[in-house]
Amino acid sequence: MGAIMLDGKATRDEIFGDLKPRVAALDAAGRTPGLGTILVGDDPGSQAYVRGKHADCAKVGITSIRRDLPADISTATLNETIDELNANPDCTGYIVQLPLPKHLDENAALERVDPAKDADGLHPTNLGRLVLGTPAPLPCTPRGIVHLLRRYDISIAGAHVVVIGRGVTVGRPLGLLLTRRSENATVTLCHTGTRDLPALTRQADIVVAAVGVAHLLTADMVRPGAAVIDVGVSRTDDGLVGDVHPDVWELAGHVSPNPGGVGPLTRAFLLTNVVELAERR
């Protein structure tokens, strides 16, 4: 008997269904939400991701604002583009698509974004608000993970969650979300310095793999019946694969596919953040 699939695409469609009337109400009030993107360079993955975001906007009625820049731009040009979107009244929120070319400082670019227009929830000010528990845009992927677990009635309160990966977009903020009183999980954050990773993952009720190492998590590392969230993506000779080995499906209780699990929800909550920013104005 295999695991139950945590269907991110179906869950995304439910979120879009919720967003459409909210966007229509904002539009009727003259406050149409607008999502902006800044894309530097011609990385195929980044281009596809940005195209997907703007296609999502069209589905729910959000205005698209797109700024595509060549890979060899200067820091000054990038800053001018960020400042322009900060000042643009049609842009409710926006993102700087990562990664940036190596000659540009990603942290400096993210810090230059107006925190009130931070659609990704990754501005240092908003991450600080997450620590404090005060209202702010939430990081999209961690928010999507929590929503997916709740959608399938997977108990979070009191659960032991092992998160593999300490990146700023998933691992670190996910631990903050899961330890809020509203979630009340116990979180173990694992990384390259963790000793005996399998011993920890075998204790977990929920495992989140977010490191980008192909098939890192294998069946012998998972407790029978556990929920497994596959976030990381690696490019191999066989195409794109996740962090979770296929044999985990035979043992776990729930597994998110990759692709088709967390990815669609990351994009859905990007739009949700923009709509919520518009509603708060």
Swiss-Prot record:
Domain of life: Bacteria
InterPro entries linked: Aminoacid_DH-like_N_sf, NAD(P)-bd_dom_sf, THF_DH/CycHdrlase, THF_DH/CycHdrlase_cat_dom, THF_DH/CycHdrlase_NAD-bd_dom
A GO BP annotation: L-histidine biosynthetic process
Substrates-to-products reaction catalysed: (6R)-5,10-methylene-5,6,7,8-tetrahydrofolate + NADP(+) = (6R)-5,10-methenyltetrahydrofolate + NADPH; (6R)-5,10-methenyltetrahydrofolate + H2O = (6R)-10-formyltetrahydrofolate + H(+)
Source organism: Mycobacterium bovis (strain ATCC BAA-935 / AF2122/97)
EC number: 1.5.1.5, 3.5.4.9
Protein name according to UniProt: Bifunctional protein FolD
Subunit annotation: Homodimer.
